[in-house]
Amino acid sequence: SSLNYESLDSNKISNIIENLKNNIFKSDKIGYGSERHLFATAITPDGIITYADQLSSEFKKKYVLTGGPGFGKTDILKFIGSSGQKKGYFIEYMHDPFVPERIEHIFIPETSTCIITNNEINQANYTGIEYNLFDYTKSALSTSKKDDIKYNSDLFYELINKGISLIHNAHLLHDELESY
């Protein structure tokens, strides 16, 4: 993820943040907005399951951030969420199931707006006003960095699948033990 993060153009990312902030929060409200923290995606014995599509189905405006690990999705979401709260809006933060400190999606019910992510964990293909963060990098990655990213990605998915397999087996054993 650090390889991707190094390639981001901070000026372009700042433009995304300002654009989103101005489009979502057209007026200020009185006071500081409250927040709620939840998970929309989970690691289960049956694999990775996400409910972001169902949770976002009633929202009129959907922004989609697409990008792999290290593309700054959490930073963007935290900034937009914090800005919304400062302007008085209630923000729902959906956390990443692997690293709960990271944010996967945010929902702003008062404006019927959400920012959801297509990412390496949920592997979803959400539709909406899309920002493909790969388009906001400084320049083409060197071949060695591409090779490192590919290796890391392959290893990540191999370990994820192994972990899910172990959770699945533990679940089966748990069910068997409970039958006694």
Residue spans for each PLM region:
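Anaerobic metallocofactor- and corrinoid-dependent redox/one-carbon enzyme cores
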Residues: I48-Q54, L77, N118-T127
